[in-house]
Each structure stands twice: as C-alpha cells, then as structure tokens.
Amino acid sequence: MVAVCIVFIFMNGESLGIKRLSAKPQYESKLFNQDKVHQIDIRIDDWDEFLENSYDEEYWKCDVVIDGEDFYNVGLRIKGNSSKRLVHDYGLQRYNLKLEFDHYQDQYYHGLDQLSLDGSFQDNSYMKTWLTFDMMRYMQVPTPLCSYTWVTVNGKDWGLFLAMEEIEESFALRNYGKDHGKLYKPDYKSLDDENADVALRYTGDEFYKYDNIFRNAQFDINDEDKKRLINSLKILSEGENLEEAIDINEVLRYFTVQVFVVNLDNYLGKTGHNYFLYEEDGKLQILPWDYNLAFTTYSLGMPNPINDAELYVNYPIDTPSSGEIMMKRPLYHNVMKNDTYFNQYHEYFDKLISEYFESGYFKEFITETYEMIESYVEKDPTAFCTYEEFQVAVETLYEFCDLRAQSIRGQLEGTLPSTIKEQSENPNRIDASSVWLPDLGELKDLED
C-alpha cells in the first residue's frame, strides 16, 4: 500500500502542487566541468570580415567543435558595450563572443541554448568574473556556470577565454525548473537619463515608465507579467511587507558578494546596471553578471580615475555607495532599513569571510586556478597583457581580497568603521599601501 502511494505521488506530484526537481543538465558536467581547460574551435569562412563588422551585432553562421564534438550551423556574434567599443577603438580584435546553438536550427549543446566567451577585458588576472561567480555560488546565489576554454579559429590559436552560460532559457530551466518565471536585464539607453526603472524604483503603474526593464525581457511577456513586476516594485518602494515581493535571502546573499568585490559598474554604482532580474509569482531576485570591472577597476577608466587601494580595501559594507546613489537603490536601501534583514546581511558576511577566506579555501582556489591556466596565458596570442603582467595581477587580486576580508572582519566586529560617515570621523583602516590597483588591468594596457 505504501509503495502504491509513493508511485501515485511520483506520477501526480505536480498536479498536487509538488514541484519535481530537474536533473542536472548534461552541459554542466561537460563544458562547464571546472577542473580543466576546455577546447573550442570556431570554424567560419569569413573570420576577418566578421571582425571588421563588429558593430553590427549580427549573427554569422559557423560550425563549432567543443572538446571534440561537432555542432553545425551555430549562430556567432560579437557582444559587449564599452568593452566592444574600446577594443575596436584601440585597433584590437579580442572581442567577447556569443554562441547561439539554436539560432539557425533546433539544436542544443547537451541542453544548453547559448554561451558567451569572455575575453577578460581590463582583467589581467583572467580571474575577476571566475572568482566572483565562485563566491556567488558559494553563497547559494543562482549563478551562471563557467569554465576556462582555449579558443581556436579554423584551427589557429585565438586565446584563453572564459566560457559562460548565458542567462537565458537553459539557465532558467536549470535553476528554476520548467515552470520558471520571467527574466529581465534592465539597462539604460543613455546614462544621462534618470533611469529610475533600472534602479528598480516605483514611479507609477504606467508600463512605459519601465521600458528599460520590459524591452530587455529575455522571454515573451504580457500585460499581466508587467503588472505583477510593477506591483513588486511598488511594495519595495513602500518598504513594508518586503517578503511579499522580494526573495530576501537571495538578495542579501547577492549583496554580500557584490559589496565585497567593490563592483562600481553595477546596481550599487552610478550606472545601476549589469545585473539580471528574475520574477516569479510576484517575487524578485537579483542575479550576477559582468564582473570584468569589479575589484575597483571601473574607477580606473573614469575621466578622473581614483587609484586608492586603501579606500577600496576598506570600502564600508553598510553604506557601499554615496547617499545620493544609495537613496535611489531601493533593493539595497529599503531592505537594509529593516533591522532583521540588516543583521542577517551581517551574518552572511560573517559566513563569507570565515568560510571562504579565513578557512584557507580562497587561497587554495586561486592557487589551483593559477596552476590550471598559467601555461595557456603564457601562449595567448591575443592577450590584453603580458605573461608577467598576468602573474602580477594574480598576486594583486589575491592581496586585495585578503586585505578586504581583514577589513570586513574588523567592520563586522566594530573595530573598523563600516559607514562612510564613520570613516570620515575614524581614521582606522587596514593598510593597503602594498596594493597597486592598475596592476589588475587598466585601459593604458591596451596601448602597449
């Protein structure tokens, strides 16, 4: 009788409200096995012409060989915003690439619809995205899979890239199941605009006020989807009953890592973009994306660059942006105004610092990664930096993170100031004079 009941539940679980867990997709253990450097050969007739038309963002047909497996009629295009423009302006050709397996025909790479190949622009360590994604996964934030990949074009060496699972249908299926919600990539048309929607601010019920969200929907959406998301933003703006509209646990875990890596080209920075928004049944999650300018290097590309390692090593965890920006970022500001959530945020920080850094895991992770990729970096024909600059960048990244962890430990324990205001009154800091931030990667490197 018990066996019959178990079979009945298994056969009818979803109709009874029980969500069936999906098995891991095959591509997770194949291309995204992180224990080795993979191989991708792009076979395309007009590679030079493809590169010359980088601004078109049109798909070109190619064949791809991934770790010895052939895939035909795959869509290939160049991707990126400022990185694409700057690579072009400096007369280089190492663009970020996107492969779309189902662009021309109904096919997948073992269940994967799309992947991108990141060229480590302004990242001499080759590790900024790799490390941040690992931290996000450690904190149980839904995160794209990634792996190092040696890319060749028509059999000729092109370079070491980071293959990344695109946040599209396959990502949603892997993380949320077949009944998943909606995904958006909020982004502005012009940084000079107010862009309240990118900042997730509620400004009324009219759909047009959220164009920067809705025109960047990853899936088809209807009016009910729009109303549901706008209502979530309304609840967020009111600051009450936030758990009805926000996945509090996920958001706090995300911001723990986000604040650690000091990514100023993201939700907590002036631009407010470079994240994905997931909505299901009226609840929102924020998802990680685009970390080549993390670890403070976004500031090095500004008209008046700030090269202050001590400032960023000690960046305050409780006010990780100026008041002008913070007041316009409700997903952080309104959540942190709740004492329970604020204390939970500190608990997650304690977990990250104690388990990821103080335990020795971080040192081992960086060391193993270096040993895995260093021979590929040494022979990379399109690298943005020299092999020696890569070695220095890895040391710099390690030292920055080690000192940052020490500073945050002090901020959590109250021996170091944890807000901008407190830091203006209290000079105590972790000494970061040994860290030279430009070693992580700056625009000047592109001139060499």
Regions found by a protein language model. Give the residues of each.
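Phosphate/dinucleotide-binding and metal-coordinating scaffold of catalytic cores
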Residues: 1-448
